[in-house]
A protein has these predicted regions:
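Alpha-helical transmembrane segments of multi-pass small-molecule/ion transporters
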Residues: 1-308
Length: 308
């Protein structure tokens, strides 16, 4: 457990530092938005390409992807049960479904790298290659189908995926690894420099994006569905993973990815597609804080299973 806390505490500290810098106005909101854009377009793709290109995969990671995707689909479907919550509006249902299927890639990459080095980074990157498209498609359809707005042009989730640089980075990295193409030294070192900046800046930006004021507006619905997400996704991943023979490091990485809080950009997507943006902000704040408690519990399960 001490090794996990050694990896988790720096992540929490950087998220807290980002919140402090934003709250005090020491770094303007525009600067963090620019950092988000830089990370999305350049830094994270560089990290993913390098991690995947230098990885050596056997059959286990593909079983890992199957468990993660199946868990996303099942927990997304479970979100439909929110319609039985008294007084709930349709946009909130779409937002709950989105919360259930999205995950924080930056925190996953941070923990995977700190705990397991390059192999951990590669496995988390591979998980991202599968989970990001699934999360985007489910989220867009859920938000649009539950939105209360005049009929008009419907967003096209598949088109949105073609504009996502993280997807291209995953495809490039997997292609390089599949064909055993080694990156030239100069290219590898350049990507390494960009990758080193990706996680630190991403965690600072994630902290800046947490609206602590949202916790004051949060109620039973927010905390109930936050716990469903933080406990439910890793639990379903574990059951499916064990059923299909997942074990060892891939199992540990799958559980870590599933146990991260919902994605910070879920607020923007909810706002743009007619979801309940206020509830999305509540989920981000509540899950980011609760994950500091649930992630160590997940690690305890990993140790109990002897996965690492």
């Amino acid at each position: 457990m001490s090794a996990f806390l050694t990896a988790l505490v720096p992540v929490i500290l950087l998220v807290a530092l980002g919140q402090f810098l934003a709250k005090r106005g020491l770094v303007p909101a525009e600067a963090f938005r620019a950092l988000d854009r830089l990370s999305f377009l350049v830094l994270l793709p560089a990290l993913i390409i390098r991690a995947l290109a230098n990885a050596e995969f056997d059959g286990a990671p593909w079983v890992m992807l199957g468990a993660l995707i199946a868990a996303q689909v099942l927990l997304g479907a479970f979100g439909l049960s929110a319609r039985f919550w008294p007084g709930i509006a349709p946009p909130a249902i779409g937002t709950i479904i989105q919360s259930n299927v999205r995950w924080n890639t930056i925190i996953g990459l941070s923990l995977g790298g700190l705990l397991f080095g390059d192999e951990g980074l590669a496995l988390v990157s591979l998980a991202a290659a599968a989970m990001i498209p699934v999360a985007n498609v489910i989220s867009v359809y859920a938000l649009v189908s539950h939105a209360e707005r005049p009929p008009g042009d419907k967003p096209r989730p598949l088109l949105a995926l073609t504009r996502n640089p993280l997807i291209y980075a995953c495809l490039i990295g997997i292609a390089l690894a599949s064909f055993h193409v080694r990156l030239p030294v100069i290219a590898d070192e350049s990507l390494k420099m960009l990758a080193n900046a990706a996680i630190a800046l991403g965690l600072l930006s994630a902290g800046a994006g947490v609206d602590l004021g949202a916790l004051q507006r949060a109620g039973l619905r927010t905390f109930t569905w936050s716990l469903v997400r933080l406990i439910g996704l890793p639990a379903v991943t574990l059951v499916i993973g064990l059923a299909i023979g997942l074990s060892g490091l891939p199992l540990a990485i799958a559980l870590i990815c599933a146990a991260t809080p919902t994605a910070p950009n879920s607020y923007v997507l909810a706002r743009e597609l007619g979801g309940d943006a206020g509830l999305a902000a509540n989920f981000i704040a509540a899950q980011t804080l609760l994950a500091a408690l649930t992630l160590p519990l997940t690690w305890g399960v990993i140790l109990w299973l002897g996965a690492v």
